[in-house]
């Protein structure tokens, strides 16, 4: 091997070897245990960023480790290629989304190869190709035939100036991001898939996902939001009954008004002769509110003039249109109990409505609702026959009475809504439905699929080209003229089943069941926690749809889930003339630090003093991204990978420090140097365990302890950083170990082979070279080192000796020494005996293998 470690030469050579030998191409092998490792596939944005590098490095480390465990490992990669950024880039660069996307894929594919990730490139696909989305279209038509797909009108963001629908992220402060026109809410027909039919199963099966972070499961439980409650009817004078859903029927006697959503049919009726109310409803409709903002926004309402009748005590209560009642949850109407619900309390206080308390604390303490509602569960009072009942008893009794009188029923509700899959964008898979002239809607027959998205288009940045081109929509159905659906699928559709397509990417169906059931479920999935509620839930749903269609036998797609932490970097800015922040790349800033490493001054290349904003997530907007390509060019891929895995636990945030990258590079140079020095002296003999001295046994014990620890850290705990730390610690000992005798060299030889094998999943290129230098064959198909139980057995123990609680000496004794033998050696230790001079020994306590404690006075 070369004397100097030169990553560029090594990495190019090793990557060429993997390419030529198709090292990571796999097929099904029933004789081997399979392992399917998958990192969330990237959006081809143009360049890899450090977040990608971290995600894919973790996946590659797991894959290569499992491979050395003798498993048949599949690690595929592909491209989540549809989506809005491509449309925006196309408009900006005066091109079409397709060529921009395919160019980015080529560039990023090369970047992935330079990082040495062991992918089976034979399985690669991009979701924007008809070969992929054709199967999604066909599966959608099958779901339609099963009654799991329907169309209904739903509210979207509409720009009246551009006459186009906007995604939520295209609305800035209530205005269109392009022309600054106030955005309106518009009802348009959209396609939905009935995920709600699977809500209970999606909830229940979370309990089977033992390999998932508890936090993700909690987020999904809350998102699905199962609640048990009562659906009850309030009569409304001169109108239809008003249905409300409540999880707190125990508070029913405290209802003082009913709130309805602006889109509720009753609101529309009430507004017919009330222009003020009509204007208020319009205002509500055009403030589309995310659920997160509901709690903090100002509660507004207006009386409808309608009166509802309390179902049990007959009290008349007013009906209000309220901006915090959502049409798409429950029934679009709520019974308001201001004394026991904070939102209702704020509203009632604002509009001077009655506040009637009916629940008091269980512990008998005084009820105080002067400042806020009392929202705890308690004991009922002023509730007639239900007085004195606690929550569950009151729930059951009130529900039973409502049911007996035909005014209500116990029901289970879910916060989860059906999945709206229509997008009024161009760069997505066309929805395979047509409408004939008689207004009937039909799925496109399988033999006419795929419905191909034209790629050679001109983007004006306003209207989708397939909506603008009236000819594209014209087609026939059973010989009759028909119009195609011009909406495209939500891009979460493609990413909901891609993991399954990798099992049989060339299959002439959505997937090949035999291959899919060999590989699925995915054994290890790696990606960001920001996908907890959307992508991960939709994928679980899609897997159950595939199961119920007979394609897969498993219930869940991903056995284990690791959510990697974000990559942070220093961010710097200066204030411009307009008082805004101009962000400066950390690569253009010179910093001075104090003794504790804190930044005391920062100056950019222009000589400006810049402010340090702290360590924050790498992003384009803060200009604090570090280009992985530059780091690979400077230090090599192995160094970047090692830093990524060592700098922090995989699921925690990682702080990018170039000094840490330099440290990782120095470590690899040290390993290279030791292997080079060792191998240059020729072959070493085998270890003869029986012939080792005490020091040699101790060093060999350290080697095997390290193997045991690293194996556990990687396989079970997934604390890769502590595994690397253990190897570094061992390297320090090996560097200092004597090399005099043949057995010294034999132990070092065994140790270096173990070190190289343990580092291989993390730094595969350098280890490939060092493995060959150590006289070994083909590390890609080698076996993970196993520790020798015998080597871990200690012949001797180091015992601490205390006199009256203070350490006075340390002694070495045989591992099987008796208490008497230890006592004799301990009492005669020079420093110990000095402290026992002229005192009486009262008691001697021996903690085997650890401590001898002497009490004397």
From Swiss-Prot:
The keyword ATP-binding applies. Keywords: Aminoacyl-tRNA synthetase, ATP-binding, Cytoplasm, Ligase, Nucleotide-binding, Protein biosynthesis. SUPFAM superfamilies: Anticodon-binding domain of a subclass of class I aminoacyl-tRNA synthetases (SSF47323), Nucleotidylyl transferase (SSF52374), ValRS/IleRS/LeuRS editing domain (SSF50677). A motif ('KMSKS' region) lies at residues 617-621. GO terms for cellular component: cytosol. The keyword Glycosyltransferase does not apply. One of its GO terms (molecular function) is ATP binding. A motif ('HIGH' region) lies at residues 42-52. It holds the Pfam family tRNA-synt_1. Its main location: cytoplasm. GO terms for biological process: leucyl-tRNA aminoacylation. It is found in: Cytoplasm. Disulfide bonds: none annotated. It catalyses: tRNA(Leu) + L-leucine + ATP = L-leucyl-tRNA(Leu) + AMP + diphosphate. It comes from the Bacteria. Gene3D superfamilies: 2.20.28.290, 3.10.20.590, HUPs, Isoleucyl-tRNA Synthetase, Domain 1, Valyl/Leucyl/Isoleucyl-tRNA synthetase, editing domain. InterPro entries: aa-tRNA-synth_I_CS (IPR001412), aa-tRNA-synth_Ia (IPR002300), Leu-tRNA-ligase (IPR002302), Leu_tRNA-synth_edit (IPR025709), M/V/L/I-tRNA-synth_anticd-bd (IPR013155), Methionyl/Leucyl_tRNA_Synth (IPR015413), Rossmann-like_a/b/a_fold (IPR014729), tRNAsynth_Ia_anticodon-bd (IPR009080). ATP binds at residue 620. Its EC number is 6.1.1.4. PANTHER family: LEUCINE--TRNA LIGASE, MITOCHONDRIAL, LEUCYL-TRNA SYNTHETASE. Belongs to the class-I aminoacyl-tRNA synthetase family. This is Leucine--tRNA ligase. It comes from Vibrio vulnificus (strain YJ016).
């Amino acid at each position: 091997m070369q004397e100097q470690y030169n990553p560029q030469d090594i990495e190019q050579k090793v990557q060429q070897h993997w390419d030529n030998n198709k090292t990571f191409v796999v097929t099904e092998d029933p004789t081997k245990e399979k392992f399917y490792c998958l990192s969330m596939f990237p959006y081809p944005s143009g360049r890899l960023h450090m977040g990608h590098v971290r995600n894919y490095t973790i996946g590659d480390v797991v894959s290569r480790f499992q491979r050395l465990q003798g498993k048949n490992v599949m690690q595929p990669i592909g491209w989540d290629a549809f989506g809005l950024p491509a449309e925006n880039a196309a408009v900006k660069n005066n091109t079409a989304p397709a060529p921009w996307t395919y160019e980015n894929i080529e560039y990023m594919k090369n970047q992935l190869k330079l990082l040495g990730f062991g992918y089976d490139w034979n399985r690669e696909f991009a979701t924007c190709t008809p070969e992929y989305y054709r199967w999604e279209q066909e599966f959608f038509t099958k779901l339609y035939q099963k009654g799991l797909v329907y169309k209904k009108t739903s509210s979207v963001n509409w720009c009246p100036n551009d006459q186009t629908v906007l995604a939520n992220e295209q609305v800035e402060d209530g205005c269109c991001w392009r022309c600054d026109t106030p955005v309106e809410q518009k009802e348009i027909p959209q396609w939905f898939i009935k995920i709600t039919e699977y809500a209970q199963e999606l909830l229940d099966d979370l309990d089977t996902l033992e390999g998932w972070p508890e936090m993700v499961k909690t987020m999904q439980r809350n998102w699905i939001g199962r609640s048990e409650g009562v659906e009850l009817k309030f009569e409304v004078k001169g109108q239809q009954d008003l249905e409300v859903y409540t999880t707190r029927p125990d508070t029913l006697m405290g209802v003082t008004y009913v709130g309805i959503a602006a889109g509720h049919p009753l609101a529309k009726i009430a507004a017919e002769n009330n222009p003020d109310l009509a204007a208020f409803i319009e205002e509500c409709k055009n403030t589309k509110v995310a659920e997160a903002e509901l709690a903090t926004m100002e509660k507004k309402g207006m009386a409808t003039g309608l009166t509802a009748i309390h179902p049990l005590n007959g009290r008349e209560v007013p009906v209000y249109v309220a901006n915090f009642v959502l049409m798409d949850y429950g029934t679009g109407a709520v019974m308001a109990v201001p004394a026991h619900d904070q939102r209702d309390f704020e509203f009632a206080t604002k509009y001077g409505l009655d506040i009637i308390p009916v629940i008091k604390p269980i512990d008998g303490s005084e009820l105080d609702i002067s400042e806020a509602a009392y929202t705890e569960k308690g004991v009922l009072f002023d509730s007639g026959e239900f007085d004195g009942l606690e929550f569950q008893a009151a729930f059951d009794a009130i529900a039973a009475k409502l049911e007996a009188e035909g005014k209500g029923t116990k029901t289970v509700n879910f916060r989860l809504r059906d999945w709206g899959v229509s997008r009024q964008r161009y760069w997505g898979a066309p929805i395979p439905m047509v409408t004939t002239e008689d207004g009937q809607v039909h799925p496109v027959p399988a033999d006419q699929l795929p419905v191909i998205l034209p790629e050679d288009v001109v983007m004006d940045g306003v209207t989708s080209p397939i909506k603008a081109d009236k000819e594209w929509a014209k087609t026939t159905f059973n010989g009759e003229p028909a119009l195609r659906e011009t909406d495209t699928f939500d891009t979460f559709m493609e990413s909901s089943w891609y993991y399954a397509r990798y099992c049989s990417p060339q299959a002439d169906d959505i997937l090949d069941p035999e291959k899919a059931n060999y590989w699925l479920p995915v054994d290890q999935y790696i990606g960001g926690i920001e996908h907890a509620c959307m992508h991960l839930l939709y994928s679980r749903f899609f897997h159950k749809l595939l199961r119920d269609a007979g394609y897969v036998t498993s219930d869940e797609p991903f056995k284990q889930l690791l959510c990697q932490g974000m990559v942070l970097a220093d961010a710097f800015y200066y204030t411009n003339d307009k008082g805004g922040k101009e962000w400066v790349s950390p690569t253009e800033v010179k910093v001075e630090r104090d003794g504790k490493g804190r930044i005391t001054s920062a100056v950019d290349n222009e000589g400006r003093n810049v402010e340090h904003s702290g360590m924050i997530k790498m992003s384009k907007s803060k200009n604090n991204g570090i280009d992985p390509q530059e780091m690979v060019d400077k230090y090599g891929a192995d160094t970047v990978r090692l830093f990524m895995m060592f700098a922090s636990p995989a699921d925690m945030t990682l702080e990018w420090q170039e000094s840490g990258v330099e440290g990782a590079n120095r470590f690899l140079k040290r390993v290279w140097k030791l292997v080079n020095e060792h191998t240059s002296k020729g072959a070493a003999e085998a270890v003869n365990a029986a012939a080792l001295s005490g020091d040699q046994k101790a060093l060999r014990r350290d080697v095997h302890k390290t193997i045991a620890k690293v194996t556990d850290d990687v396989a079970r705990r997934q604390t890769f950083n502590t595994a690397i730390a253990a190897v570094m610690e061992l390297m320090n000992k090996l560097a200092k170990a004597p090399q005099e005798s043949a057995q010294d060299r034999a132990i070092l030889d065994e140790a270096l082979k173990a070190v190289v094998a343990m580092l291989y999943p993390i730094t595969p290129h350098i280890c490939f070279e060092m493995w060959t230098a150590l006289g070994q064959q083909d590390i890609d198909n080698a076996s993970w080192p196993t520790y020798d139980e015998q080597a871990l057995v200690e012949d001797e123990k180091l015992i601490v000796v205390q006199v009256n609680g203070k350490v006075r000496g340390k002694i070495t004794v045989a591992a099987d020494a008796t208490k008497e033998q230890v006592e004799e050696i301990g009492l005669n230790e020079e420093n110990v005996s000095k402290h026992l001079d002229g005192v009486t020994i009262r008691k001697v306590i021996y903690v085997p293998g650890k401590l001898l404690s002497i009490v004397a006075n």
